[in-house]
Amino acid sequence: MVAVAILAAGKGTRMKSSLPKVLHPLGSRSLVERVLNVSESLHPQRKLVIIGYQGQQVRNTLQHLDDIEFVEQKEQLGTGHAIQQLIPHLEDFQGDLLVLNGDVPLLRPETLQNLLQIHQDHGNAATLLTANLPNPKGYGRVFCDGNNLVKQIVEERDCTDAQRQNHRINGGIYCFNWSKLAAILPNLTPNNDQGEYYLTDVVNFLDPVMAVDVEDFLEITGINDRKQLAAAYDILQTRVKDDWMAAGVTIIDPDSVTIEDTVTLSADVIIEPQTHLRGETIIASGCRIGPGSLIENSRIGSDVTVLFSVISDSQVDSGCRIGPYAHLRGEAKIGANCRVGNFVEIKKSSIGNKTNIAHLSYLGDATLGEKVNVGAGTITANYDGVKKHQTMIGSGTKTGANSVLVAPLKLGKNVTVAAGSTITKNVPDNALVIARESQRVIENWADQFQ
């Protein structure tokens, strides 16, 4: 059996924020959610989050996740003290405990799987993740024998000049035999200048303790301030974009593009510069997205072109051309082979196949049939100051330029709306509707002002 404990009690004063450090977002997820997510690769039987500073806020953020147990650390007296709080919660647990930090979000599943496998294969009392850094300044050093068995962990401030030449550092990720750890946890003492209980001190009481080097030391990058948060985002983005390019996606100018790791892309998608893909977005093969576009929590069908546009919480079917400067939001559904042109906004509306909305229109709370042509400047006046109302437009209908459709309203099939009309009443199939003042010409009008 495997239990996972995540240290999430700290305040994170260097973040200069009222938000607990572990709740700061890295892309689409908070730091601690990323740690929980990667730990799922081990299929743990128990998942414990140790909380302290603004613990209720951490609880509220994670309440949508299944089977999370919260352990309160009322005083933050170090990592060893945090793990001591687990004793009553794991009283009957028999198995291994993986200890992770809630502010180390870049670990890969393979790294944790390898750590656990080595720990179990060797029957270790403890196994810790280490790294060889080119510049280990600021980190405690790990000293091992030729079999990678840990003999000593020394904090940098306590290192001699000779010890500082060792570049192997402690990554702060541990796997313990819980029964052996629980037996010695009460023996920890705050024997240091900070008055804290260090988890690293258990090395003096457990045997054997083995070190496992991580292949990419960037995986154990911790987040302590906003600069490190930004650096972690860059690392995450590089991973995501490299993976998609290896899978057949073209990304033009990757440095100007962001793709969250919750996005799903197909082969032969082309991502133009200054494009940002977020949330649970899915983009099918043959699409060309950008430049200058933002798509969030949306599903894009095959062979769609999106130029300089914003799409959120919406669906675009295959063969459409969106933009430039279009805005689709609030569950907009665009049928196949539609054109949504410049300065068009569509909100909570369903658009039938082969419909054209070429420019300068607003459609809200509307349902359009197939092969509708929406003239320039057409808007649905869907809000009466209290409620939103529906507009229905039948297939084959054409609206003239500068038309206003005042909801609730139903236009039949093959209706023609004359330019400049304000329509307030339902219109039957195959009708021409004109609702505007008759033109008057007053000759010689200017003469009176001369």
UniProtKB/Swiss-Prot annotation:
<feature type="binding site">
    <location>
        <position position="347"/>
    </location>
    <ligand>
        <name>UDP-N-acetyl-alpha-D-glucosamine</name>
    </ligand>
</feature>
<dbReference type="GO" id="GO:0019134">
    <property type="term" value="F:glucosamine-1-phosphate N-acetyltransferase activity"/>
</dbReference>
<dbReference type="Pfam" id="PF00132">
    <property type="entry name" value="Hexapep"/>
</dbReference>
<comment type="similarity">
    <text>In the C-terminal section; belongs to the transferase hexapeptide repeat family.</text>
</comment>
<comment type="pathway">
    <text>Nucleotide-sugar biosynthesis; UDP-N-acetyl-alpha-D-glucosamine biosynthesis; N-acetyl-alpha-D-glucosamine 1-phosphate from alpha-D-glucosamine 6-phosphate (route II): step 2/2.</text>
</comment>
<dbReference type="InterPro" id="IPR005882">
    <property type="entry name" value="Bifunctional_GlmU"/>
</dbReference>
<keyword id="KW-0133">Cell shape</keyword>
<comment type="subunit">
    <text>Homotrimer.</text>
</comment>
<dbReference type="InterPro" id="IPR029044">
    <property type="entry name" value="Nucleotide-diphossugar_trans"/>
</dbReference>
<feature type="binding site">
    <location>
        <position position="376"/>
    </location>
    <ligand>
        <name>acetyl-CoA</name>
    </ligand>
</feature>
<feature type="binding site">
    <location>
        <begin position="382"/>
        <end position="383"/>
    </location>
    <ligand>
        <name>acetyl-CoA</name>
    </ligand>
</feature>
<dbReference type="InterPro" id="IPR001451">
    <property type="entry name" value="Hexapep"/>
</dbReference>
<feature type="binding site">
    <location>
        <begin position="7"/>
        <end position="10"/>
    </location>
    <ligand>
        <name>UDP-N-acetyl-alpha-D-glucosamine</name>
    </ligand>
</feature>
<keyword id="KW-0548">Nucleotidyltransferase</keyword>
<keyword id="KW-0012">Acyltransferase</keyword>
<feature type="region of interest" description="N-acetyltransferase">
    <location>
        <begin position="248"/>
        <end position="450"/>
    </location>
</feature>
<feature type="binding site">
    <location>
        <position position="170"/>
    </location>
    <ligand>
        <name>UDP-N-acetyl-alpha-D-glucosamine</name>
    </ligand>
</feature>
<dbReference type="InterPro" id="IPR038009">
    <property type="entry name" value="GlmU_C_LbH"/>
</dbReference>
<dbReference type="GO" id="GO:0043886">
    <property type="term" value="F:structural constituent of carboxysome shell"/>
</dbReference>
<keyword id="KW-0961">Cell wall biogenesis/degradation</keyword>
<dbReference type="InterPro" id="IPR025877">
    <property type="entry name" value="MobA-like_NTP_Trfase"/>
</dbReference>
<feature type="binding site">
    <location>
        <position position="419"/>
    </location>
    <ligand>
        <name>acetyl-CoA</name>
    </ligand>
</feature>
<comment type="pathway">
    <text>Nucleotide-sugar biosynthesis; UDP-N-acetyl-alpha-D-glucosamine biosynthesis; UDP-N-acetyl-alpha-D-glucosamine from N-acetyl-alpha-D-glucosamine 1-phosphate: step 1/1.</text>
</comment>
<feature type="binding site">
    <location>
        <position position="436"/>
    </location>
    <ligand>
        <name>acetyl-CoA</name>
    </ligand>
</feature>
<keyword id="KW-0460">Magnesium</keyword>
<feature type="binding site">
    <location>
        <position position="362"/>
    </location>
    <ligand>
        <name>UDP-N-acetyl-alpha-D-glucosamine</name>
    </ligand>
</feature>
<feature type="binding site">
    <location>
        <position position="329"/>
    </location>
    <ligand>
        <name>UDP-N-acetyl-alpha-D-glucosamine</name>
    </ligand>
</feature>
<keyword id="KW-0963">Cytoplasm</keyword>
<feature type="binding site">
    <location>
        <position position="21"/>
    </location>
    <ligand>
        <name>UDP-N-acetyl-alpha-D-glucosamine</name>
    </ligand>
</feature>
<comment type="function">
    <text>Catalyzes the last two sequential reactions in the de novo biosynthetic pathway for UDP-N-acetylglucosamine (UDP-GlcNAc). The C-terminal domain catalyzes the transfer of acetyl group from acetyl coenzyme A to glucosamine-1-phosphate (GlcN-1-P) to produce N-acetylglucosamine-1-phosphate (GlcNAc-1-P), which is converted into UDP-GlcNAc by the transfer of uridine 5-monophosphate (from uridine 5-triphosphate), a reaction catalyzed by the N-terminal domain.</text>
</comment>
<feature type="region of interest" description="Pyrophosphorylase">
    <location>
        <begin position="1"/>
        <end position="226"/>
    </location>
</feature>
<dbReference type="GO" id="GO:0009245">
    <property type="term" value="P:lipid A biosynthetic process"/>
</dbReference>
<dbReference type="GO" id="GO:0000902">
    <property type="term" value="P:cell morphogenesis"/>
</dbReference>
<dbReference type="InterPro" id="IPR050065">
    <property type="entry name" value="GlmU-like"/>
</dbReference>
<dbReference type="GO" id="GO:0009252">
    <property type="term" value="P:peptidoglycan biosynthetic process"/>
</dbReference>
<keyword id="KW-0808">Transferase</keyword>
<dbReference type="GO" id="GO:0006048">
    <property type="term" value="P:UDP-N-acetylglucosamine biosynthetic process"/>
</dbReference>
<feature type="binding site">
    <location>
        <position position="373"/>
    </location>
    <ligand>
        <name>UDP-N-acetyl-alpha-D-glucosamine</name>
    </ligand>
</feature>
<feature type="active site" description="Proton acceptor">
    <location>
        <position position="359"/>
    </location>
</feature>
<comment type="similarity">
    <text>In the N-terminal section; belongs to the N-acetylglucosamine-1-phosphate uridyltransferase family.</text>
</comment>
<feature type="region of interest" description="Linker">
    <location>
        <begin position="227"/>
        <end position="247"/>
    </location>
</feature>
<dbReference type="GO" id="GO:0000287">
    <property type="term" value="F:magnesium ion binding"/>
</dbReference>
